[in-house]
Amino acid sequence: VIRTVLTVTLAVAILAAAVPAIENAQIQRTETTLTSDLQSVRAAATALAASEDAIEPPAPGARRVVTVDLPERDLSAAAVESVRIDAEGLTYRIVEGPSDTVPFETDARVVVRPRNDHEAITLTAAGRHHLVLSLQYVNATRTVYIERLD
């Protein structure tokens, strides 16, 4: 009986010591994944504006489709509160973790087209979200439009 009690006590102590390290690893993995995906969106906007010709609407201009993957909370990933995309950049918030903004680095104007009356696209559900970036020439200004595909 004493051996069983000691074994259980030792197991609980080891688990209690390991939980903060596991949570830290979850947050770091999620942060790395989000930063990579958001930098891909930024790179697509930059490349689109730098390497393609803008045309006048209503003709469709050059476009790119980029995927942002919000991980679901599990043993290897922390939960994502939100990813917000506006004209300034892309901001993520991790539940009980950090938040950060990846700014756009393009000479073109960036316009976000959300589905509702908001000024930003907000992603909250875990899973893959597809964004369409298109380049148009509006009022003598090269403009990158960003909208959700799904």
Per-segment meaning from a language model:
Residues 69-150:
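Intrinsically disordered, low-complexity regions enriched in Pro/Ser/Thr/Gly and acidic residues
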Residues 13-16, 25, 57-61, 137:
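Residue-level signal for the start and early helices of compact helical domains
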Residues 39-40, 63, 116-119:
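N-terminal start-of-chain detector that recognizes signal peptides
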Residues 49-74:
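Short, glycine/small-hydrophobic-rich surface segments
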Residues 1-51:
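Hydrophobic alpha-helical segments
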Residues 36, 55, 59, 80-82:
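General "foldedness" signal
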